[in-house]
Regions:
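A short loop-to-beta-strand scaffold at the N-terminal edge of the catalytic core in hydrolase folds
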Residues: 3-12
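Conserved HGGG/HGGXW glycine-rich cap/lid loop of the alpha/beta-hydrolase fold
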Residues: 11-57
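Glycine-rich "HGGG/HGxG" loop immediately N-terminal to the catalytic nucleophile
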Residues: 31, 52-68, 124
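Conserved acidic catalytic loop of the alpha/beta-hydrolase fold
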Residues: 70-86
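Conserved hydrolase catalytic core segment
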Residues: 84-124
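Conserved alpha/beta-hydrolase catalytic His-Asp/Glu region
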Residues: 142-198
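Conserved serine/cysteine hydrolase catalytic core
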Residues: 175-236, 241-244
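Catalytic histidine-centered segment of alpha/beta-hydrolase-like enzymes
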Residues: 248-261
């Protein structure tokens, strides 16, 4: 990136094929898209998912600068390396990043946009639950079982894995001998209600200039996206299509990856140029 930060990415497919960029949510990594990226590649898409700065295997910002404008600049840089304008799929924080970047380049950055369980204005109770989890456990975990218990408490509707070894993709062993989440703890800072309102208004004001196709996919059990938030976005983005994934909460791709893939299939067929491809 322009400030020297290196971003880790996973790619499937070949350059020159219909391009798709996938952005994970806050506290997640590119591995949250693992199944979708692999499937897209087998169907002839050039799919790329990368760890946001301060997450996963990507570098941490020295300053630190983790504003949405900074994340949007990173996305713009990645998109500029693709052979053609991509479809951008963003979950939660990734969706907010996509809206900021596309709002700055409403007709040239992306071919289409998919928002995953996010809108400019979200349910404050659901947002607090997410933030409490992301800002909790600052002292880390003694072992994988303790980390798995924390995740199970946050996602009670999802079965607790019998073997928690997969969590190691999201954990790092630090000098204190404890396991800590992979992200830079400076990334998640509490924002005031006034700051969140200014951010929501800024995004909503950008929306009328966005003319590309757009899809919002939300989890039927989500406590983050509300009916009011969806309708407010749709009023500013009239081309917005809306799809629901039954049995999924805020973390749709992790809760129901098969159903999520099915929800985006028709949209990608129409706007990424692969007639007849099915993601299942």
């Amino acid at each position: 990136m322009s400030d020297g930060v290196a971003l880790a990415a996973t790619v499937s497919g070949e350059r020159g094929q219909a391009a798709v960029i996938l952005l994970h949510g806050g506290g997640q990594t590119r591995h949250s898209w693992q199944g979708t990226v692999k499937k897209l590649g087998t169907l002839g898409y050039h799919a790329l998912a990368f760890d946001a700065r301060g997450h996963g295997d990507s570098d941490w910002s020295a300053k630190p600068d983790y504003s949405y404008d900074r994340l949007a600049e990173d996305l713009e840089t990645v998109a500029s390396k693709m052979a053609d304008a991509p479809v951008i799929i963003g979950a939660s924080m990734g969706g907010m990043t996509a809206m900021h970047a596309i709002g700055r380049h409403p007709t040239t950055l992306a071919r289409a946009m998919v928002l995953v369980d996010i809108a400019p204005r979200v349910d404050p109770k659901g947002l607090k639950r997410v933030n409490d989890f992301l800002n909790g456990y600052r002292d880390g975990f003694a072992d994988l079982e303790e980390a798995a218990d924390a995740v199970a408490a946050y996602n009670p509707h999802r079965p607790r894995p019998q073997n928690p070894r997969g969590l190691m993709k999201n954990l790092r062993l630090r000098d204190d001998g404890r396991l800590h989440w992979h992200w830079d703890p400076r990334f998640f800072r509490e924002r005031s209600d006034e700051q969140r309102e200014r951010s929501a208004k800024r995004l909503l004001d950008m929306c009328p200039d966005i003319a590309i196709p757009a899809l919002l996919v939300f989890g039927a059990q989500s406590d983050v996206v509300s009916a009011e938030g969806i309708e407010e976005l749709r009023a500013r983005l009239p081309q917005l299509e809306v799809g629901t994934v039954p049995g999924a909460g805020h973390m749709i791709a992790g809760d129901r990856n098969d159903a999520f893939n099915g929800a985006i299939t028709p949209f990608l067929e129409r706007h990424a140029g692969l007639d007849g491809a099915q993601i299942a």
